[in-house]
Amino acid sequence: MASLSLVLRYVVFLSFFILQKPKETFSSRLQRSHAKVAQIGADDYPSSGRNTPVHDLGFPDFPSFQEAVAPPPPPPDLPLLAPPLPDVPLLPPPAFPDFEKPRLPVPVWPSLPEYPPFPFVDQSAPYQGFAPRFDESANWMPSTPSIPQVFPCLRFKSNLLRVEFWVSSGTAVKGKDRFCNRPSKLDPNPVDLKTVRLPSKFRLKKLLCRVESSEVCFGDGNEKDTNPSEIDLDSLPFDLKMVILTRLSAKSLTNFKRVSKMWSSIIGSQRFIDSFFTMSSKQSRCPKFPVNTRFVGYDPIDDQQKALSVSVPSRKRNLEHKVLTLGGGGQGWRHIEVTNAPFSPVTVGVSIDGFVYYGAYSPTPPMNPVLVCFDVRSEKISFIKAPNDVLQWGFDLWILEDVERHEWSKQTCVFPSSVAWDYVGDIQMSFPGTNKAGIGDDEEFRRCSGFVDEGECHVRIAPQHVESIARFKDPIMSRILM
């Protein structure tokens, strides 16, 4: 009786529960499914536009019924970085008799192997240069297990940036797997770097951007985010280091040897010493300064004194003639034009009856001597030819014929007027007490140079001096020279 009473009570309770709960129809289940999907999109992307990806699955946000039936907006004029997705067909809204409002249509997307999802491409947004719309609060491309994802691989070639997309296996990137050596699922799209504005920094927490040789790929989060503007000098090629160091001065190279052992070995190597010597020999070590000669003349008619300045910037250029009137009321130097061939002054000027005369010669062959005449009043220059046999240079050359017998022979050399002084490039060299060939009497030379009774004067000219970093084996001489 007790067991029968318990069974009857259970049957009565179950019957009462079944009678009180309404039966769920197919329409109610479908309505609940649609409401759940819409709530997911509204919670995750409250402010997103149309066709914004949800959970990297490709589900778009749900527009209103008027937006669904409205014609799509025209495509932008600029090309998209990634190929656009095909138009998604929308099913007509089903008729639900127990619904007050029609429910939103459910989009039908293509299968995943044929068209992989693009979690970072916004098809409705205007062209932004680089594909993704970045989320400032989280990863725009998270590594979620069991969800296939797309990873870009950027390749540089000239001024073009090639963007290729690779589909991962649905797991996070581990180690140094770059996805850059796998076959492409989509056709690459060349982008001109001059017109595309790339983001200065990728906002990724787990995936960072790294430069490896000629490719820019996405690496793992264990790599350091370095500044691309900083260049490691040790990573430069050896030949490039040699070129940079050869353009420094010898004093700077001496200090740079203390930077590292590698730099010290490079600077001290014979190959670098030869390269530095070759580079230094090509540079001019003898600067050219303009030679200025000034003459003062007097004009008895106008009772004025004027100064003539002749500047010789180079032998291959015309001379610069300037005139200054002394006491002329603040007038400065004035240029005067000389149409004749340039003649360089070689003698001291003499002022006679309103004219200034000085000896000169032509700097170009045949280098004829002339007498320059400057009219102080009219400020004009004229030339008077001089006889060629007036200016002659020569010297005696002693030649040692026999070393054992100490026999010498003498030769007298006479230069014609076409031969001028001893030249060092474009610079003339002469010394007091010597003739035009640089040879003179020892007593006269010592008297003009200040050596009257004691000592000798030795003049050493090294016009071909070239700076070098070669060192002597003697450490004392090395310290003195360096």
Swiss-Prot record:
InterPro entries listed in its UniProt record: F-box-assoc_dom_typ3, F-box-assoc_interact_dom, F-box-like_dom_sf, F-box_dom
Residues spanning the membrane: none
Limits of the F-box domain: 230-280
Protein's name according to its UniProt entry: Probable F-box protein At1g30780
